[in-house]
């Protein structure tokens, strides 16, 4: 990452930060603004947790966008006006020239053109200035009218809500709708859509086309509403304002900011931070709100109880589409037979969604209030939005962008928590199946066919039998001798799966078309839930959000259209009971092909995070084709004073701390670790969080401590808490841990696992973590199928490009090493949350004392490593005492 600019080199630009920004926030905002302004294609920004990163992103990017729009309005609009004026003039000249024109007039026409050009050049300056002002004023007045229109709609809505609240009408309407929705469906609703194989081509993209058709219908109804609006009704606006709103849709700025993050809470935080800000308008002497839209999936935005309460996102999607095809349809969606009422609500929703900064929950409440679907209606505001937030999957999948009609060309893409981007891309395009899963599916299919066989048309009967046969062949393959003897990570060629069977007679492409058209996965799941046999017996933890058939469908799609950047390979799935089962995996191994489409279309892609190191993975595997001079790297320090954090690498305590995999059963080292922690607990106040590389290692260590006096001695000093693999216990564990720290003088110690919920989703501020201790280096299992397959792929790529075997192995090891260091940075970055916070970080392993490992720590951590930690005279306990004896440390 690049070094920080000197104070004298920074700009004095006003970023409209709602508070007095810290120096590092100004550095961050300067760097991001310059990245956008100077034509960089990629920006990589690291800002530690607790440094106000989100506000810095908002203020710098929105300041740039308003500056850009202001310049766009002054220059581009003027250019468009000149072109339009010249076109009109030329059209008039061409019309005149056609009267009595003959070949002898050609030279005269050329002379006339020259004369016209001279006339344009000779126009007085005041005429040119007046013309320029008229062009700019036209756009300014459009914006002013639209802002006034949004104000009027917002105020009218608030008055109506208050009136309805007083009359208690809203609840009555919603209860009636909910009662209608929860009525029991007849058995016919579980039947798959009729299927005729001769028409299968038209059904391949059925879901996507239906989404696009519905969006088009909403858009048509909105336009119709604007044209026919007669000013009546409780939410009426005058014709001039409606016309201004319609005109504004053709006058949007071509550049938008797309902000994406991994979790719902992070996106809501973005909304709340955006509410704090206010920026200069795109025109002088004008008030302009920030026009913001949060986009989400049906799971987040659906307000139909019958649909949104289904299990799994894909099941919700299919239920929505299925409901639209019924005679009554969905009560919240446009109905052509009642277009005036529905389009009015849809249009009002689109306006209200832009009138204020709202989060996803606000849009759900707004849709319920207006009795219109938020998922579809919110799209109608996209054209005029300046800032759009959305979860990773909606941005990273081209099909999702198409369904939402998202045009990311020339836009600013900001990816927050970017260290998650690799895992997200991989999971979106990867799937695994097991024999137990297939057995479960076959059993469910037999139950389903026994019930509905006589009601199925021939196309469904034939294809369900083929699907059952296909699942049986896949199950046999997973139980074959080949599968049992295969090494983890070994590649599987698609043709091998059906070799020696009649499976090759089943056309996978046609089967995929059938699955898309019939919605059998959704129908099957619905019926299984109704009769109460969803779980037909497996101890292995598969994706519970994709029950019964959905993962099988995804796997068959990968089998039908495998990406060249992905591969099939063998792996294992381990159950809670200690057993394991063979799995057949498909995994996207090269994410750059998927990401390239986004990079190519966007004006600039900004990757932000609290822990971006090591950064080489981004440049090597996410955008390798981007030249280094088009990549801006920035890393800032922390807002805390330098003496509020100390980092101590510890390589030995009565022997080396060496937590290599081959020493995972070193009982002596486990005991020395316990004795070290006891001495630390005697010094550190309040809470201590200890990160250990795996649940198994944590269990082994605690077992040894309990067999000796270590655990009881540790518990006397600080109450011991252990992270459980069960997520259901997380909330109660944290609550009890916090309660003990806040009510008992001795404090507590939390034994957590790297990669668990504690290491990624929880921030340990203030007394919750006065010390964070990392035990060993958390390398992932080198022999897992996914790691083996990924490293093999990297080595193949290096050799294909002319590299040696040694270079290939070095490159794949660097990837493996970086996985470990990312986990380290992510875990130890949870302790500092604000400017007055303080903590000590202890890294227990001799490898943390090496320059190579320290070079991959986050910059703000690296800068605070204690001096001379490898010297024989270095005493980590003395350093810890010094840290907490500093006056500020004596109180919270």
Swiss-Prot record:
It is found in: Nucleus. [4Fe-4S] cluster binds at residues 302, 320, 330, 373. Its EC number is 5.6.2.3. Residues 86-102 have a biased composition (Basic and acidic residues). Residues 80-126 are annotated as: Disordered. ATP binds at residues 47-54. A motif (DEAH box) lies at residues 416-419. Residues 103-124 have a biased composition (Acidic residues). GO terms for biological process: establishment of sister chromatid cohesion; interstrand cross-link repair; mitotic G1 DNA damage checkpoint signaling; mitotic sister chromatid cohesion. Its cofactor is [4Fe-4S] cluster. Residues 11-474 form the Helicase ATP-binding domain. Its main location: nucleus. Binds 1 [4Fe-4S] cluster. Keywords: ATP-binding, Cell cycle, DNA-binding, Helicase, Hydrolase, Iron, Iron-sulfur, Isomerase, Metal-binding, Nucleotide-binding, Nucleus. It catalyses: Couples ATP hydrolysis with the unwinding of duplex DNA at the replication fork by translocating in the 5'-3' direction. This creates two antiparallel DNA single strands (ssDNA). The leading ssDNA polymer is the template for DNA polymerase III holoenzyme which synthesizes a continuous strand; ATP + H2O = ADP + phosphate + H(+). One of its GO terms (cellular component) is chromatin. One of its GO terms (molecular function) is DNA binding. Pfam families: DEAD_2, Helicase_C_2. ATP-dependent DNA helicase important for chromosome transmission and normal cell cycle progression in G(2)/M. May have a role in changing DNA topology to allow the loading of proteins involved in maintaining sister chromatid cohesion in the vicinity of the centromeres. Has a specific role in chromosome segregation during meiosis II. Belongs to the DEAD box helicase family. DEAH subfamily. DDX11/CHL1 sub-subfamily. This is ATP-dependent DNA helicase CHL1. It comes from Lodderomyces elongisporus (strain ATCC 11503 / CBS 2605 / JCM 1781 / NBRC 1676 / NRRL YB-4239) (Yeast).
